[in-house]
From Swiss-Prot:
The active site is at H115 (pros-phosphohistidine intermediate). The gene is ndk. Its cofactor is Mg(2+). It catalyses: a 2'-deoxyribonucleoside 5'-diphosphate + ATP = a 2'-deoxyribonucleoside 5'-triphosphate + ADP; a ribonucleoside 5'-diphosphate + ATP = a ribonucleoside 5'-triphosphate + ADP. This is Nucleoside diphosphate kinase.
């Protein structure tokens, strides 16, 4: 099974959207295998967003992501990266499809409620950055036989 990294951002935490977001992810057949509520250390935020260091929004992004708790998680399922990207929606909530997490709950590009890995390679890098292997729990759920061929 494929895994991906998702992070519910501070704006969603402050708006009490964690339960709704997780519910949408689970209803799509993805299984939560690791999760933690945490305040992000500066160094972790900088490493996570290292690809954006030269962009004008970088400083604000780091300040935002370290300003309040996030809910970091790893989910597992068939095509987990693509499935999660689809239900998350486009980065800009005004361009995201209605029914997607960002389309329904996001406010602006800077307050778009959730981060999701954009590729299998990014997912692996981000999972390794945020979680130790012993913090992840793979398991078989009875529903798996109904979800996957």
């Amino acid at each position: 099974m494929e895994r991906t990294f998702l992070m519910i951002k501070p704006d969603a935490i402050q708006r009490n959207l964690v339960g709704e977001i997780i519910s949408r992810i689970e209803r799509k057949g993805l299984k939560l295998v690791g999760a933690k509520l945490m305040t992000v250390p500066q160094a972790l935020a900088e490493e996570h967003y290292s690809e954006h260091t030269d962009k004008p929004f970088y400083g604000k992004l780091i300040s935002f992501i370290t300003s309040a708790p996030v809910f970091a998680m790893v989910v597992e399922g068939e095509d987990a990266v693509d499935v999660s990207r689809h239900i998350i929606g486009k980065t800009n909530p005004s361009e995201a499809t209605p029914g997607s997490i960002r389309g329904d709950l996001g406010l602006t590009v800077g307050r778009n409620v959730i981060h999701g890995s954009d590729s299998v390679e990014s997912a692996q890098r981000e999972i390794n950055l945020w979680f130790k292997e012993e913090e992840l729990s793979s398991y078989e759920a009875p529903r798996d036989t109904w979800l996957y061929e």
